């Protein structure tokens, strides 16, 4: 760590501790009575239980940076997807671009604002089932929020308990499972109108049926959402070309044969179909894009999991097995560079040139663990896991009439078209068969020296393996045979974790934490690029240091939290782009991220509530970085996908009158950032993002079991740029959805 970084970190730590002391003085003076004698208070803030440490505990007791958005909070703000809520948590930026490739960045740990070429830096889980397969992630899951119990956001590396890809942090979707104690049902319908778009709608339903009371139950969820397009594609002559439809559901079966045994089955199916890409070309106008072909994106996720929880008394045993299948198919317009193919290959292509890209994966995971009962002086956890995946990735370039064009080429001649483009269109393709494995032994122990002081020590011994066999066919190998290459990487290591917490009262906790994270190295699949690229990237790792405090005061009506962190990142995996717009991965250099996260929750009475968070961070290169084909990004350059400042506010007021009218105002601010490291090279045109404010307003009234909500999103119609990418047809900007008004009806049994 550099001396300057030391000084900045120490200043941040002092500020965090000062904030904690300011909150702790009144908390000690007003210590609450024991829980068993305390009278319930409607003004107390909600107590949220999380499983961040793979055991249930209050979010206020976790010696780490954990936030949780409850199912009720998701409903209150009308959240449908990650874009609606994830940035409300400290230290998190959502780089929205296209379904399946939009990317969550935690604490600035990223080298691209999108999910391109390799394993990401944020882990995704559904009820603790990993959704990031080893190596390249086919689809970044964005699970519909209907009937979720909560979404847990773990900031900082989670490699000890959650494995690879959780370098920056993890997101754990917690879905409600079947409840055998009674019948339940819910229905929700939404109609909305977005500027420059058709009318949107959504319909969702849930039913929970106890087959045998307290023994066996089934819960089913179904949803459909149509988000109409708001971009006009002048090349296609289509208004609102970027229509997106999301459909799917979940199924849960829970069997509790006795009080010590629980079997839980959970299935997820979700399909997202986007008719066209969601980036605009600002040089052409406000909400305008221009392509010769529709750039569709189709994604499918299927997951089945079976979980056994067995209470032995002296320990709890958990076995969690899963099977998942993902598929993603894209199309990109390459027509603007058709002229170069015609010139270099003596072709006369006149139809649009396109790239088809995507893949599918099948993954299987198993985790076994023993956990001691909570509340003892020594708590421990021991576990083992295994995850393997088989993937097929493809990249193919084509155009209608390609076979005929090659037959007419002086470089290839008659008869070549049938060999080069057997389907008549695809004339160069690159296929990769990838197998990935991850296995690990992990454990964690917490010892309470006194009721106030606790020490936690943990570690993960892991081994990873990736094998890839790639095949290239088309004009680049003609007249020879297809070119087949194979490569394999094996890596192993150990991730430690140490934390120390001090809880002088029920209302105050201080903690210090050191943890590590890692992710797989990956081979490159940009086989169609005309430029030479590295064969792939090796694994990278980081170390996270943080100090934090959680304080509760004013008899439980106010919570103030502060965290200071410093992340040291080495051998960083870079996500870069060739001059002909293909993404590739390599390793290089060092980086750091340091910052302060502040959050507050205040509920002075049972009518008003204010939730707020402020994050300051600096995620920067720690040394000069040479970028192939681009130049050198100097030390101190900003890391992509991050912002130095983010501010979030949620104010809610419930009027004390008939129908309980409730008014909720939310605000988000995100400072400027860049979308890729190529932008950091002096003289390059920066791909910028961020620097916007968003305001949403909701008004809800309750009529018995039915809530009716009127809402307005992006009230100022801000063109907040969430990601910028250099496309062949111009600089493309992903933007937040334009101003939207609508109404939602929610009925609960």
Feature map (PLM): residue ranges:
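Transmembrane beta-barrel wall of Gram-negative outer-membrane proteins
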Residues: 195-274, 300-305, 361-362, 366, ...
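Outer-membrane beta-barrel translocator/receptor signature
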Residues: 119-121, 132-134, 145-150, 155, ...
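Structural signature of Gram-negative outer-membrane beta-barrels, strongest in the C-terminal barrel
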Residues: 254-259, 268, 370-373, 385-387, ...
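N-terminal Sec signal peptide and the immediately downstream disordered periplasmic leader
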Residues: 1-79, 83-88, 208, 259, ...
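Periplasmic plug
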Residues: 94, 103-157
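C-terminal beta-signal and adjacent terminal beta-strands/loops
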Residues: 668-678, 700-749
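Membrane-embedded beta-barrel scaffold of Gram-negative outer-membrane proteins
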Residues: 204, 307-334, 503, 509-517, ...
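Gram-negative outer-membrane beta-barrel transporters
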Residues: 31, 373, 380-381, 448, ...
């Amino acid at each position: 760590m550099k001396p300057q970084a030391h000084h900045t970190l120490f200043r941040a730590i002092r500020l965090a501790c000062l904030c904690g002391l300011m909150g702790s003085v009144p908390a000690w003076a007003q210590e609450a009575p024991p829980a068993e004698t305390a009278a319930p208070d409607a003004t107390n803030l909600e107590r949220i239980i999380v499983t961040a440490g793979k055991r249930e505990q209050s979010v206020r007791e976790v010696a780490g940076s954990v936030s949780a958005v409850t199912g009720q909070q998701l409903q209150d703000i009308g959240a449908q997807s990650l874009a609606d809520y994830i940035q409300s948590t400290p230290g998190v930026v959502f780089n929205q671009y296209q379904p399946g490739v939009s990317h969550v960045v935690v604490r600035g740990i990223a080298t691209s604002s999108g999910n391109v070429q390799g394993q990401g830096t944020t882990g995704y889980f559904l009820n603790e089932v990993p959704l990031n397969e080893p190596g390249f992630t086919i689809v970044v899951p964005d699970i519909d929020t209907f009937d979720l119990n909560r979404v847990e956001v773990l900031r900082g590396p989670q490699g000890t308990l959650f494995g690879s890809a959780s370098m920056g942090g993890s997101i754990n979707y917690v879905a409600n499972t079947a409840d055998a104690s009674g019948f339940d049902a819910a229905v929700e319908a939404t109609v909305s109108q977005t500027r420059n778009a058709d009318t949107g709608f959504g319909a969702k339903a849930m039913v929970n049926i106890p087959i045998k009371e307290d023994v066996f139950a089934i819960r089913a969820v179904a949803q459909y959402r149509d988000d109409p397009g708001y971009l006009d594609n002048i090349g296609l002559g289509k208004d609102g070309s970027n229509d997106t439809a999301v459909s799917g559901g979940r199924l849960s079966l829970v069997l509790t044969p006795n009080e010590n045994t629980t079997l839980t089955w959970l299935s997820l199916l979700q399909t997202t179909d986007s008719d066209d890409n969601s980036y605009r070309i600002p040089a052409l106008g406000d909400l305008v894009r221009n392509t010769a072909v529709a750039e569709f994106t189709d994604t499918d996720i299927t997951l089945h999991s079976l979980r056994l929880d067995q209470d032995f008394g002296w320990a709890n045993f958990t076995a969690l097995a899963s099977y998942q299948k993902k598929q993603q198919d894209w199309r990109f317009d390459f027509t603007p560079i058709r002229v170069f193919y015609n010139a270099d290959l003596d072709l006369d292509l006149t139809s649009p040139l396109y790239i088809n890209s995507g893949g599918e994966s099948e993954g299987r995971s198993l985790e076994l663990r023993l956990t001691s009962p909570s509340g003892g002086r020594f708590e421990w956890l021991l576990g083992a896991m295994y995850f393997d995946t088989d993937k097929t990735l493809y990249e193919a370039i084509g155009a209608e009439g390609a076979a005929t064009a090659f037959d007419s080429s002086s470089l290839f001649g008659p008869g070549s078209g049938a060999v080069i483009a057997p389907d008549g269109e695809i004339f160069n393709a690159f296929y990769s068969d990838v197998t990935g494995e991850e296995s690990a032994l992990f454990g964690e122990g917490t010892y309470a020296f006194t009721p106030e002081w606790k020490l936690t020590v943990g570690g993960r011994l892991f081994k990873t393996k990736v094998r890839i066999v790639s095949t290239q066919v088309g004009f680049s190998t003609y007249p020879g045979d297809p070119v087949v290459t194979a490569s394999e990487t094996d890596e192993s290591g150990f991730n430690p974790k140490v934390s120390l917490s001090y809880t002088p009262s029920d209302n105050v906790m201080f903690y210090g934490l050191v943890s590590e994270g890692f992710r797989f190295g990956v081979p490159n699949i940009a086989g169609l690029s005309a430029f030479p690229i590295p064969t792939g990237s090796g694994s990278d790792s980081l170390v996270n240091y943080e100090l934090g405090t959680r304080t509760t005061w004013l008899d439980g009506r106010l919570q103030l939290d502060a965290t200071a962190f410093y992340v040291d990142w080495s051998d960083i995996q870079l996500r870069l782009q060739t001059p002909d717009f293909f993404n590739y991965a390599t390793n290089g250099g060092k980086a750091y991220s340091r910052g302060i996260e502040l959050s507050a929750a205040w509920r002075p009475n049972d009518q008003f509530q204010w939730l707020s968070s402020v994050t300051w961070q600096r995620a920067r290169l720690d040394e000069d970085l040479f970028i192939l084909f681009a130049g050198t990004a100097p030390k101190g350059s900003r890391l992509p996908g991050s912002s130095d400042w983010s501010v979030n506010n949620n104010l809610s007021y419930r009027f004390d009158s008939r129908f309980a009218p409730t008014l909720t105002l939310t605000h988000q601010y995100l400072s400027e950032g860049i979308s890729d490291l190529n932008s950091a090279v002096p003289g390059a045109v920066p791909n910028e993002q961020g620097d916007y404010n968003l305001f949403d307003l909701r008004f809800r009234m309750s009529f018995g079991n039915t809530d009716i909500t009127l809402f307005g999103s992006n009230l100022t119609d801000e063109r907040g740029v969430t990601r910028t990418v250099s496309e062949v047809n111009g600089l493309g900007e992903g933007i937040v959805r334009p101003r939207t008004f609508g109404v939602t009806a929610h009925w609960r049994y």
